[in-house]
Swiss-Prot record:
Its job: Protease I is involved in virion assembly and maturation. Protease I cleaves the portal protein to yield mature procapsids competent for DNA packaging. Isoform scaffold protein Z probably helps the capsid proteins to assemble into a functional capsid.
Protein name per UniProt: Protease I
Organism: Escherichia phage Mu (Bacteriophage Mu)
Acetylation found in the keyword field: yes
Family: Belongs to the peptidase U35 family.
Swiss-Prot/TrEMBL induction comment: Expressed in the late phase of the viral replicative cycle. Expression of late genes is activated by the viral late transcription activator C.
Domain of life where this protein originates: Viruses
Record-level GO BP terms: proteolysis; viral procapsid maturation
Record's comment on post-translational modification: The N-terminus is acetylated.
GO cellular component: host cell cytoplasm
Amino acid sequence: MKKHAIGIAALNALSIDDDGWCQLLPAGHFSARDGRPFDVTGGQGWFIDGEIAGRLVEGVRALNQDVLIDYEHNQLRKDKGLPPEQLVAAGWFNADEMQWREGEGLFIHPRWTAAAQQRIDDGEFGYLSAVFPYDTATGAVLQIRLAALTNDPGATGMKKLTALAADLPDILQQENKPMNETLRKLLARLGVTVPENADITDEQATAALTALDTLEINAGKVAALSAELEKAQKAAVDLTKYVPVESYNALRDELAQATAQSATASLSAVLDKAEQEGRIFKSERTYLEQLGGQIGVAALSAQLEKKQPIAALSAMQTTTAKIPSQEKTAVAVLSADEQAAVKALGITEAEYLKMKQEQEK
């Protein structure tokens, strides 16, 4: 669990550039003149770099108010009965008046009050001191909340400063502030689970931001599609290119019905013709109708064309041919055995039939 403490640090001397910028904290590891901090792991003191400085600037920006510069940190002692004239501001600065200079440190551009500027010009104050919370594990500075003009930067010990910090934000007072339960639930909805009594890690924060970015992108897509849908609904339909779906479905059904009727009629015509030509038996018709339904009229017609007509069937199934009297013609159909007998006897079919008729008398 991370622990936070409060630090106070002052430069060796108040140094103001010609353009009004002055150094608030040095770059890298640093400590107070009296050796503080004593509770940072490894004993390397407080620490600030460019990345930390960026967070400090954004932290000040999130306050939505200027940071106070007072005299001798009197704001931390206001509950001790100090007179009002000792609680006045010496100056102010905001996030836009903060600047990180690599290798040098964190600089601010204070807006001094006229009285403070005069006292600085007169040399009444020699140091600029900052009040900040820090991580006891790394020494990293966590926030800039107050600054002060002072002449005794090491006079205030940590115990005394901690006791006087009642008016600072919660982050300066609480070493272990539990995460807001609503925030924990929100992170869980984003797929980021933070254990109870634990701080959110940088990786978890990045995952939450990525999830929010994804939601934002998807929301943009939904908005774009909604706009296109609304536009399409308002636009008039070009009836030369589109027809109502009801009309299309009705036409499709009529076409299917007509096609089925046409196929049935064509199949019947093919079977009638084959039957008249003696290519099929009447008893085959039901089977052939089913076959035609499966393979199609064209395929069935091609198969029937290959079958040899049977003269007897043609004569029996025609409705127009007249069957001549057996007394006037010898035309008849012989069985296979009779045809074999004709060939064996060396006579014609007519002669065979005549012989057969005489035997039947």
